[in-house]
UniProtKB/Swiss-Prot annotation:
Keywords: Cytoplasm, Fatty acid biosynthesis, Fatty acid metabolism, Isomerase, Lipid biosynthesis, Lipid metabolism, Lyase. The active site is at H70. The keyword Membrane does not apply. Homodimer. Transmembrane segments: none annotated. This is 3-hydroxydecanoyl-[acyl-carrier-protein] dehydratase. It comes from Xanthomonas axonopodis pv. citri (strain 306). One of its GO terms (cellular component) is cytoplasm.
Amino acid sequence: MTRQSTYSRDQLLASARGELFAPDSGRLPNDPMLMFDRITEISNTGGAHGKGVIRAELDIRPDLWFFGCHFIGDPVMPGCLGLDAMWQLTGFFLTWIGAPGRGRALGCGEVKFTGQVLPSARLVRYEIDVSRVINRKLVMAQTDARMLVDGREIYTAKDLRVGMFTSTENF
């Protein structure tokens, strides 16, 4: 498939099934772990560091699966799901640029949560800025990210790292 600058939910789910890029390339998780509905922008130029950018959105609905279990009587989106979305998008970027293998989160430098996503929210927006891409024996991207709910920044992460592995047997 030709590289695009935007992707719909159906296309993202095709990635989860191995149908968007090469069958042996990296994949996004399937529902319900896919944590965004669309990619509104992806580029290997631009962003805060000039090395690439990914922008994505998640429509918030009160019936999303995590609100029913986290927490009963006090529903809130788990912070780890927003962080995972940032890793998912970083891995998607590596697959999008043609990096071989399967993506795995390798860590991050710093994470801050300064707000929460409640069922009354409407839209989560992810803004990912690529700071480094290594494409040698080790294939890895490093990014900085922000998550906004209804336009307000609530999560930041620095130095998110995702690597691509042609074999995950010894990982």
